[in-house]
Amino acid sequence: MALDTASKSQIVNDFQRAQGDTGSPEVQVALLTARINGLTGHFKANAKDHHSRRGLLKMVSQRRKLLDYLKGKNADSYRNLIERLGLRK
């Protein structure tokens, strides 16, 4: 579901490259991950909500594209980000 302002600003502060950075791939991936984690809990209670599932799949795809971009541009930042977010097992 949607993130509240406080949690969104906390995520931005944790992952921004410089003060005022809200659009870097690291910040975008962190925000998408928080939204994906929230929706994953939603599907435990609402298994037949296929409309929201499509939105979840679009978010996962967008996150994957951003991670692929980041991996090509800055591999060290990519590895650091997936470790901090716990995306790879």
Curated annotation (Swiss-Prot):
Q: Name one GO molecular function term.
A: structural constituent of ribosome
Q: Which InterPro entries does the protein's record reference?
A: Ribosomal_uS15 (IPR000589), Ribosomal_uS15_bac-type (IPR005290), uS15_NS1_RNA-bd_sf (IPR009068)
Q: Name one Pfam family in it.
A: Ribosomal_S15
Note the Gene3D superfamilies from the entry. Answer: 6.10.250.3130, S15/NS1, RNA-binding
Q: Which domain of life is it from?
A: Bacteria
The reply to whether Magnesium figures as a keyword in the UniProt entry is no
Q: Which NCBIfam families match?
A: S15_bact
Tagged with keyword Isomerase: no
**Gene Ontology process terms (BP):** translation
SMART domains (alphabetical): Ribosomal_S15
A Gene Ontology cellular component where this protein is annotated is:
cytosolic small ribosomal subunit
**Keyword terms:** Ribonucleoprotein, Ribosomal protein, RNA-binding, rRNA-binding
What's the protein here called?
Answer: Small ribosomal subunit protein uS15
- Lineage start: Bacteria, Pseudomonadati, Pseudomonadota, Betaproteobacteria, Rhodocyclales
Organism name: Aromatoleum aromaticum (strain DSM 19018 / LMG 30748 / EbN1) (Azoarcus sp. (strain EbN1))
Q: Which gene encodes it?
A: rpsO
Question: To which protein family does this belong?
Answer: Belongs to the universal ribosomal protein uS15 family.
